[in-house]
């Protein structure tokens, strides 16, 4: 690894608006003879038992009395010493060992005074390593990614058709094979940043563009803003590495001199259901706030949740992609995650599951703690909206939209326009932000994936065999039931919707009983049917097909409520697996985190502000110490005008410099002065900062300065008595009589008729949220 002199960012970068299985988090097996003063071998690029692509970056540490010329290194008996070169200081050598065969390999190092060996287990660059069998069908999109047609990997009529090309490189109609795993040759090209602020292809003749911009890196050097971009495929997904490069660089002898030895892993968000290679994002690959300062940027379509939300596959992809980067460029001084929404989720999940193997620090934007626990309350949204819009439509309470928060917890507005109501004023976060997520994630019959590549993917009609649910996308995690559908942890047995509103007197006991008798639940995947209007536009000519709630896939009362609507039980295997797998953020994370978001509550945006504090609460639940996480909010009323991320990068660089210089002090004690809880106005100017600005959210202190400025809301489960953490899929139950004795209903003491009705609605009991959720160990 090249030497590096730490130079924290001195100035704030210019703003640019931007919108594992748990066991595998353990460290790598120790190399033989590692540690102390003996000769040892360290695997730098990955765990020794999780090597991919046939190569690994190794470091051999010499023992006293030995010199570099004394060293011999072999790979399964073949001499590979020439791959190793002395590091600064001369007491170790680093080399990229290639030619590893699939399975176990042995690398041995020998010098005059000692020897060591390490066993390396190699996996295909197409994966998988630990995520389970590959998903099929899997749509290849390499042409869209600028990589050309995928490589032929079978002649069995499975996957995307690959066509012969003519003398001009144009595709003919002749099929020469198929690609199931979507591999592609690696492509390197060069771009430049124009003085107008765009990235453009560098002229092929190497001439200097007249509008070539210059940029100043972290160490103060001003260089041409030229970017080298490498693209290829890893774990079946497309990846890119970008970093500054000199104008006229020889491709065969790449010059990393402008790299500041830091890496940004740029994670992207969105909601995808898999079965596709995804799409490369120009903004993600070419992240100007980082590239302009000399950071290298890693990006993969497999770490973009718009592609899929199986974060075991995502974590595996991140590890493999980081491994490839290290093999090519050496070990960075640190890797910081950047990315919003699902990109923020990935930072929390991968930081939890893999320690510092993917990222050493995190800057999650608009984050949630994870995706899967959002399904708990988002799965309630349309059930409650349907109740208020249809079942209880005559009730004037629900005509005032802000009253809907009594049941949904999430924010509501009497001002925000509603596209499902002729754009009249009045909506909820459930409607404005989450409508459409129910069919996308729960209905196996519906998908928004209409990519044209399906037309040339074989066997014909294979797309129609996919069960389009999040559960099935991650079936290797949740498991598969006897009916062939993935198991689901979603559950609302015993959930008393509107309990807090009942206790406060905002709804009557009669209304509470009516709601819980009629709200219902979701059908099983096997019983669901195709969606109606507006999700299937072809049927919108028939008013009877209008069904924005997906009510056709609900379990409702068969007789208007006399018989209580069925509730849905989460699958016990899925419940155990979702907790054990690492898909749930449990708070087990120790890396530095600057959690930043715009305050978007007034817009009913899905990135609601409570999530930052849910993350903190879970970290506190884990070990009582959340000092590694700081929370920043920037006001976005009336609109988002300032991006605080460049400042977060600057502060994080100072934080990492402290950890590098004083590792014995740990994360919290190395915080720079600005690594504290803060809130900002729309221009990015600080309103307040310090340890008490968010008081009153997770404690009973008077509201802090930022708490007062930026109020948060709840969820359907918190206003049903559930915990702030929001991580209970299936509650443990208590008898209705026990709940009454414990005062769960406040001043309401049900009479005999009401008690009988409660027991009809909840025959197995009601939620006891003083106990941990079912399936959690």
Which residue ranges define each predicted feature?
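Secretory targeting and sorting signals
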Residues: 2-34
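C-terminal His-loop and adjacent cap/lid subdomain of alpha/beta-hydrolase
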Residues: 35-777
């Amino acid at each position: 690894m090249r030497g590096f002199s730490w130079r924290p960012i001195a100035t704030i970068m210019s703003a640019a608006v931007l919108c594992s299985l748990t066991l595998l988090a353990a460290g790598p097996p120790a190399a033989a003879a590692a540690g102390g003063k003996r000769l040892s071998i360290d695997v730098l690029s990955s765990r020794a038992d999780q090597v991919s692509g046939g190569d690994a970056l190794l470091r051999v540490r010499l023992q006293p009395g030995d010199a570099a010329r004394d060293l011999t290194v072999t790979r399964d008996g073949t001499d590979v010493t020439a791959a190793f070169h002395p590091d600064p200081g001369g007491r170790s050598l680093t080399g990229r060992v290639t030619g590893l065969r699939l399975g176990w390999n042995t690398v041995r190092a020998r010098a005059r005074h000692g020897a060591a060996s390490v066993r390396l287990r190699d996996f295909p660059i197409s994966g998988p390593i630990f995520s389970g069998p590959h998903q099929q069908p899997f749509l290849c999109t390499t042409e869209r990614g600028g990589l050309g047609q995928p490589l032929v990997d079978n002649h069995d009529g499975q996957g995307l058709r690959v066509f012969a090309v003519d003398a001009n490189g144009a595709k003919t109609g002749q099929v020469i094979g198929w690609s199931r795993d979507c591999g592609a040759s690696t492509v390197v090209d060069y771009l430049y940043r124009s003085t107008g602020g765009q990235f453009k292809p560098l002229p092929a003749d190497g001439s200097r563009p007249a509008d070539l911009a210059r940029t100043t890196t972290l160490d103060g050097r001003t260089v041409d803003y030229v970017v080298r971009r490498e693209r290829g495929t890893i774990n079946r997904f497309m990846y890119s590495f970008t970093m500054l490069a000199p104008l006229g660089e020889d491709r065969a002898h790449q010059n990393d001199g402008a790299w500041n030895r830091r890496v940004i892993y740029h994670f992207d968000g969105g909601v995808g259901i898999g079965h596709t290679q995804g799409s490369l994002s120009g903004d993600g690959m070419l992240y100007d706030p980082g590239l302009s300062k000399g950071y290298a940027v890693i990006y993969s379509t497999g770490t973009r949740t718009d592609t899929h939300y199986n974060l075991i596959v995502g974590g595996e992809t991140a590890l493999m992609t980081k491994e490839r980067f290290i093999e090519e460029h050496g070990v960075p001084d640190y890797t910081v995650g950047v990315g919003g929404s699902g990109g923020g989720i990935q930072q929390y999940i991968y930081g939890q599951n893999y320690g510092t193997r993917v990222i050493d620090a995190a800057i999650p934007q608009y984050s949630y703690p994870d995706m899967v626990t959002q399904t708990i309350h988002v799965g309630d949204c349309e059930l409650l909206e349907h109740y208020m819009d249809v079942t209880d439509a005559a009730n004037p309470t629900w005509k005032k939209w802000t009253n809907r928060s009594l049941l949904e917890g999430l924010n509501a507005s009497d001002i925000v326009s509603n596209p499902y109501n002729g754009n009249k004023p009045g909506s909820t976060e459930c409607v404005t932000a989450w409508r459409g997520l129910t069919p996308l994630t729960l209905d196996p019959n519906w998908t928004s994936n209409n990519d044209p590549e399906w037309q040339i993917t074989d066997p014909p009609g294979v797309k129609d065999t996919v069960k389009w649910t999040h559960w099935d996308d991650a079936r290797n995690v949740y498991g598969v039931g006897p009916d062939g559908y993935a198991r689901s942890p979603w559950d609302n047995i015993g959930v008393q919707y509107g309990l807090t509103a009942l206790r406060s007197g905002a709804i009557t006991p009669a209304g509470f009983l009516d709601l819980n008798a009629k709200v219902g639940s979701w059908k099983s995947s096997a019983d669901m049917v195709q969606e109606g209007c507006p999700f299937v536009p072809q049927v919108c000519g028939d008013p009877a097909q209008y069904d924005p709630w997906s009510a056709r896939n609900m379990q409702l009362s068969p007789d208007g409520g006399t018989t209580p609507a069925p509730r849905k039980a989460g699958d016990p295997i899925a419940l155990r697996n979702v907790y054990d797998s690492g898909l749930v953020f449990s708070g087990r994370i120790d890396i530095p985190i600057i959690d930043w978001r715009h305050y978007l509550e007034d817009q009913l945006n899905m990135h609601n502000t409570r999530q930052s504090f849910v993350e903190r609460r879970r970290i506190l639940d884990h070990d009582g110490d959340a000092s590694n996480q700081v929370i920043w909010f920037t006001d976005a009323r009336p609109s988002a005008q300032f991006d605080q991320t460049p400042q977060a990068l600057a502060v994080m660089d100072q934080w990492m410099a402290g950890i590098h210089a004083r590792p014995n002090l740990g994360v919290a004690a190395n915080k720079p002065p600005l690594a504290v809880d803060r809130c900002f106005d729309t221009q990015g100017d600080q309103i307040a900062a310090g340890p008490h600005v968010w008081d009153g959210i997770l404690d009973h202190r008077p509201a802090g300065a930022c708490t007062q400025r930026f109020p948060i809301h709840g969820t359907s489960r918190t206003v049903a008595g559930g915990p702030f953490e929001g991580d209970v899929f299936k509650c443990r139950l208590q008898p209705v009589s026990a709940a009454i004795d414990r005062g769960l209903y406040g001043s309401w003491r049900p009479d005999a008729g009401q008690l009988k009705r409660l027991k009809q609605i909840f025959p197995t009991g009601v939620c006891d949220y003083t106990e941990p959720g079912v399936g959690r160990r």
